[in-house]
Amino acid sequence: MPSRERSPSSGLGFQSDSSRSSPPDAGVTAHKRKRSPTRSVSSRSTSSRSPSRSRSPPPRSRRRRRSSRDRSQSSNSDESTEERKNTTRAREALEQNAKTLEIAAKGEALRSTLAQLSATKSGGAYVPPARLKALMAEAAAADPGSVEYQRMSWDALKKSITGLVNKVAVENIKSIVPELFGGANLIRGRGLYCRSIMRAQALSLSFTPVFAALTAIVNTKLPMIGELLAVRLVSQFRRSFKRNDKAVCNSTAMFLAHLVNQRVVHEVLALEILVLLLEKPTDDSVEIAVGFMREVGAFLTEEAPKANNSIFDRFRAVLYEGEISKRVQYMIEVLSQVRREGFKENPRIPDALDLVEEDDQITHRISLDDQLNIEEGLNVFKMDPEFVENEERYRSIKAEILGENSDSDKTGSEADSESGSSSDDSSDDEAGEGPDDAQRQLEIHDRTETNLINLRRTIYLTIMSSLDFEESVHKLLKLEVPEGQDIELCNMIVECCSQERTYSKFYGNMGERFCKLHRKWADTFAQSFSNYYDTIHRYETNRLRNIARFFGHLFSTDSISWASMSVIHMNEEDTTSSSRIFVKIMFQEMQQQLGLKELAERFKEPSLQENWKGLFPTDNPKSTRFSINYFTSIGLGVLTEEMREYLKNAPKLLLAQRQAALAARGSDNSDSDSSSVLSSSTGSRSRTSYSSYSRSSRSYSSGSGSYSSRSRSSRSYSSRSYSSRSYSSRSRSRSRSRSRSRSRSRSRSRSRSRSRSPSEHQRHGRRRARSASYSSYSSRSRSSSSSSSRSRSRSRSRSRSFSRSLTPRGSYSRSCSRSPVPRRRAPRSRSRSADPRKRSSRRSPSVSSYSGSETDDSISRSPSPRAGYVDRRSHRHSRSASPARR
C-alpha cells in the first residue's frame, strides 16, 4: 500500500479504472481519496496544466461527483453566513433598546429633579449648561409643547436676557444687539427685558445712555417693548415721587430723559416731569429737576425752545424766592451756566450711541396722568398653549430683523456642488461685477452737512487760536475752502464777532484785510451784509450791535462798496425795530470813524444816488418825512437836506400841475370850483408858527416845511423831529383861498388870493357883501425862500384895498385905501375863526429860525355886483384885509 501511494501520478488514472472494474479494491481506493484529497486535487491540477503528459479528459462520472460535492460545500457556507448576520443584528437591536431605556430613565430622573428644584421660589439650584442643554434636547424630542420644556426655555430666556443686558457697553453694543434678537424670544420675554434693564440702570447710572440706545434699537423693530418700558418707568416715577424715594426717582427720571433724547418717548413727558418737580419746590425736587434738565436740556432747546425758556424762567423764580438751600441755589446757577455754554458736556446723544435714524424711530406719547398698565404678569412663567406656533412666528420675525435667508444658503450649497469650469466662470463673473456693485454701494449722499459743520469748526478754531488779525487771515487763507463756500468763511467771521460781549476791532480788521486782498472777498462780504440785514431781527441786541459795528467798519474803510446799502429801505413799512437799531449803530460807527462832515460829503456822491433811493426816499412824502425824522433823531439830520428841499418843492410842483389842469377850463365857474379843489388838495389847515404862512389860507411858499433847526449858517440840527402835522396843517378859517407865490433873489413877488367872506348881516340871512382887496409889494431876499430872507432886508410895500359892499338899503359902496405895511411884519389875513395868535402858540410846536424879515403882497378880488354901486374911498379896516404882524 505504501508503494501505491508513492506511485507517480501518471498511473493513478489506470489504477482507478481497474479498481472500478474490480470490486474488492473499491474500498481501499475510497479510503485513499479521503485521506489525501489535497494530493488528488493537486494531481488533477497538474494534469490539467500539463496536457502533454495526459491528453485524455477525465471520465464523466468523476466530473459529476466533483461538481455535486462543490455545490454542497457552497450551500453550507451560505447558510452559516446568514446565521451569523442574523445573530449580529439581534445583538445590536438589544443593545440599542438597552441604551434607549437607559437614556429615558436618565431623562425622567432629570425632569423630576428639575421639577422639584424649580418649584422653589428662587428658581432652583444651579444646573450645568451641558446638562441643561441635554435635558432641553431630550424634552424637545419628547414633546416641544410640554410644560417642562416651556419652563426650561423660560429659564434659559431669562438668563440670556439678563446676561446680555449686564454685558452691554459702548464698545460692544453693536454685537450685543444681534445676540439679543437671535438668542432670545424678546416678544415672550419683553417683561424680563424691561425688568432686567431697569435694574441694571438703577445700579449703574453712568451706563444710562447705553441702555437707552439699546432700547431705542429694540424699539425700532419691536415697538411694544419700548412702550412697555416707558409705561413701567412712568409708573415707577409716580410711585417714587409719592413715597419721597429720592434715589429711585432720580434714576427713573434720568432714564426717561435719555429715552426722550432717543425719541422713544415724546418731549411732552419731560416737560410734565419738570413742571411737577418745580410746582412745589423743595431741595430734593429741585435737585432732581436740575439733573433731569442737564440731561434733556439740549434736546428741549432744539425741539421746544419756548417751553424750555419757560422752564428756565421757573428755575430763575425759584432761585429768587430763596426758599431752597444754598447748595441747590448754586446748582441752579451752574445749570444756567451750562445752558449758556450750549450743554457741551451733556449732548443729546453721544456720537458712539447715535445708531438709529430719526425717521426709523417710533415715539410713544405717554402722560403722567394716563391710566397705565404695567403688565406685571409678563415677569413670571405661564404656560403657553400655542407655544410651538409662537416660536415659529418669532423665528420668521427674527429672520426679517437679522436678514437671515435660507435661499442664500441653498444657493451657496448649489454653487459648491457645481463643476469646476462653471464655478470658475461664475467666479470670474462675480469678480468682474464685484467692484461695480461695491462702488454702487459706496455712493453715499451726505445730507447731514457734516463737511460744512467740520469746515465751520475749523474756521472757528483757527480764529480763536490766533493772536492777531494778521495771523488769523494768514491761517484762513491756507485753508482749502471748497468752491462755492466762500460765503461760509465770511459768515463765520461775522458770527464770531457777534458772540463777543463787546465789539472787538480784531474782527473788523480781519474783514477789512480780506476785502482788500481780493475782489471776491469784497463781493462776498457785501452779499453777507445783505443776508444779515434781511435776518437781523433774529439776533438779540448785543449780537446785533456787534454785527452793525463790524459792517460799519467795513463801510467806513471802503472795504465793501457803499452801493450795498441799496438793500436798506427807510420807511415805516419795510423796516423793523431791529433793522432801525442796526442802521443806527452802523451809521454811528461810520460817523465815529469818518466824522460828520466827511460822512455827509460821502453821501453826496452823485454816482451812488440811485443806490441810496431807498435810504433817502424822494418818491413819497410820507417816506421822506419818516426818513427825515429817523436820521434827525439819531443825530444825522445833516444828511436830510436834500429831502427837506424836496418837501419844499413838492407842493409847488403839485400846485403847478393842478393850475395847468384848471387853466384848460378857462371859465369863472371853473376857476371858483378849482380854487376850492386846490385849497382842499393843498391842505388849508395850518397850525405852524412860521411867519411866512397866512392864517386865512394855506400858502405853499418856500417856507412851508417846518425845520427843527437853530440857524441856517451853523447847519446844526436839533433832535426835534420833522413835524408832518405842521406841513399838512390847515387853517381853521372858513375862507377858501388860492395862492401863488413866487420868490426870486432881489426881485418883486406878487401873491394873488381870492376870498369870499360873508358879512355879519349875511350870517343872519339879511344882507350880502362882496369885497376885493388888492395889495402888492416888492422885497429883496437873499435866498430863494421868503422864510429864509435876511432879517434886515429892505422892503417897501403898498397895500391897496378896493371893496364893493352892498348896503342895507340896497345901494352899493366902493372904497379904496392905501396903507403902508410896517417893516419886519408879515401879512396876516383875518377870518372869522379864533385868534390866530393863540392858535399859533398852541398848535405850532416847531419854530423855524431860518426866516428873517418876511413880507407878503396879497391881492384879493371879489366879483362886482351886477346892480349899480357907490364908490367910496376910505381908510378902513375890513375883515378881508390882511394886517401884518411881527
UniProtKB/Swiss-Prot annotation:
Record domain MI: where: 454-570
Region (Disordered): 1-90, 400-445, 664-886
Annotated coiled-coil segments of the chain: none
GO MF: RNA binding
Source species: Mycosarcoma maydis (Corn smut fungus)
Compositional bias per record (Acidic residues), positions renumbered to this chain: 425-436
Name this polypeptide is given: Pre-mRNA-splicing factor CWC22
Major site of localization recorded for this protein: cytoplasm
GO BP: mRNA splicing, via spliceosome
Keywords: Cytoplasm, mRNA processing, mRNA splicing, Nucleus, Spliceosome
Compartment list: Cytoplasm; Nucleus
Family according to the record: Belongs to the CWC22 family.
Subunit structure, interactors included: Associated with the spliceosome.
SMART domains the UniProt entry points to: MA3 (SM00544), MIF4G (SM00543)
Residue intervals of the MIF4G domain: 158-342
Task performed by this protein: Involved in pre-mRNA splicing.
Biased composition (Polar residues): 8-22
Extent of Basic residues compositional bias: 731-755, 791-801, 821-831, 873-886
InterPro entries: ARM-type_fold, CWC22_splicing_factor, Initiation_fac_eIF4g_MI, MIF4G-like_typ-3
Keyword Cytoplasm recorded: yes
UniProt feature, compositional bias: Low complexity: 38-55, 672-730, 771-790, 802-820, 843-853
Keyword field contains Cytoplasm: yes
Pfam families to which the protein is assigned, alphabetical: MA3, MIF4G
Any one GO cellular component localisation term in the record: cytoplasm
Highest classification ranks of the organism: Eukaryota, Fungi, Dikarya, Basidiomycota, Ustilaginomycotina
